[in-house]
């Protein structure tokens, strides 16, 4: 009998989540309550409000069928940030505990500061500069302080290989940020993601919409396979990579059996398997039909299946 290795958790329900969102607390156009209602209307169950350089616990907005995560987007700009095409690091920190309001330093904000949020924030004393060493120091400190660290939209940030090649300790990276194409650059970051993987990093791929206004709602997301909709359960699933990203298709099951990768999904025209090299496998729907399942033989180009 061939052993079966499931690549997605076998749980009763997956929860739709967005982990990169802005409100009127920073430079968004909608209040936190309006943001939540917008996502809830689209079938989301998890939302992380990640306002710029400002961290807030939104647990008071939780409902039995909707969970708010605590997070912040950190911006570290190059000295020439006023110029077109200048570089910037944007990193999201997602707190493993809802009341963890640590922030690495007091950073520049170009919007009104809420004094109540300011009093509750636990500021660190890091000196943040635009350099890989400085960012790595922040990532290490954020991991130590109980956060998951996500690297945001490097293509939109005009970053190149030397800016990200040495980054260590990342939990995730935006493979797709659908707001970027609306404000001046490519929404996809596939090349950067492959570079990080090829260096031996385990970094999970994220889909987000980086919502600042209603036009951005619901363009890209992740589906989280957690046993229940609680803060601890969702964070544990995120830590382990028990989720997948999507801009539309749903994956019902994904597993390896008998040297073959098998998938069951919602309607798709094409299913691709890409690898770290120049080898791929494609299954394409025929005669204007839809694909709802596929299998790909792995024996020619996968040496082994990792167990961890």
Regions found by a protein language model. Give the residues of each.
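Alpha-helical membrane segments in multi-pass integral membrane proteins
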Residues: 170-172, 296
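C-terminal functional module detector
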Residues: 1-10, 14, 200-204, 209-308
């Amino acid at each position: 009998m061939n052993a079966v290795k499931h690549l997605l958790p076998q749980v009763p329900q997956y929860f739709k989540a967005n982990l990169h969102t802005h409100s009127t607390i920073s430079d968004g156009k909608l209040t936190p309550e309006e943001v939540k209602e917008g996502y809830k209307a689209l079938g989301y169950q998890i939302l992380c409000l990640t306002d710029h350089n400002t961290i807030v616990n939104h647990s008071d907005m939780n409902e039995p069928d909707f969970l708010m995560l605590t997070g912040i987007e950190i911006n570290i700009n190059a000295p020439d940030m006023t110029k077109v095409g200048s570089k910037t690091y944007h990193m999201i920190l997602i707190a493993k505990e809802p009341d963890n309001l640590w922030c690495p330093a007091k950073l520049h904000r170009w919007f009104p500061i809420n004094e109540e949020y300011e009093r509750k924030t636990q500021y660190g004393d890091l000196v943040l500069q635009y350099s890989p060493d400085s960012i790595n120091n922040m990532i290490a400190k954020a991991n130590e302080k109980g956060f998951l660290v996500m690297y945001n939209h490097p293509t939109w940030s005009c970053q190149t290989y030397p800016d990200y090649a040495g980054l260590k300790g990342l939990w995730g990276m935006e493979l797709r940020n659908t707001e970027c194409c609306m404000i001046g650059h490519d929404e996809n970051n596939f090349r950067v993601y492959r570079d990080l993987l090829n260096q031996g990093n385990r970094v999970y791929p994220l889909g987000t919409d980086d919502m600042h206004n209603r036009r951005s709602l619901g363009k890209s997301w992740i589906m989280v396979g957690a046993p229940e909709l609680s803060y601890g359960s969702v964070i544990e699933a995120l830590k382990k990579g028990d989720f997948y990203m999507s801009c539309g298709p749903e994956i019902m099951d994904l597993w390896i059996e008998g040297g073959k990768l098998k998938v069951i999904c919602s309607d798709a025209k094409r299913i691709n398997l890409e690898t770290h090299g120049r080898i791929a496998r494609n299954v394409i729907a025929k005669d204007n039909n839809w694909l709802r399942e596929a299998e790909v033989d792995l024996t020619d180009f996968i040496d082994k299946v990792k167990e961890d």
